[in-house]
Amino acid sequence: MEFDTKIKIVLREDLEMWQKLNVTAFLMSGIAGTQDIIGQPYLDKDHVQYLPMSQQPIIIHSSTGERMNELLEKALTKDVVITIYTEELFHTYNDEDNRAMVAKFKTNELNLVGIGLRGKKNQVDRLLKGFDLHK
């Protein structure tokens, strides 16, 4: 199956493993909840049904926090959807507090630990050119 869009997640390289997994899950929930990317439910041989997942592959990159802020600035000028996760969200425990915490910072002052992007392949690839794949 060929897609004209691409999904990429960028994680700050100094995060603990549990943080990387947590941030990736939250960022993908934002993309999956607002974009038409979810496939059909899965059925095993016993006909047990499981929830559907993204139809598209998801590519994970790593970066410094500073470079992530530069990426966000550029991404805001392109036709891509963006989801973010900031350092402060590790200390909040619900959506209302999460949104309030993000609202305390100007865009260029966000303490980014993760960014999720979805858009046309060529735009997303250009934005992430030179970013290392996560290891």
PLM-predicted stretches and their roles:
Residues 1-135:
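Positively charged, small/polar-rich N-terminal and surface patches that mediate targeting and assembly
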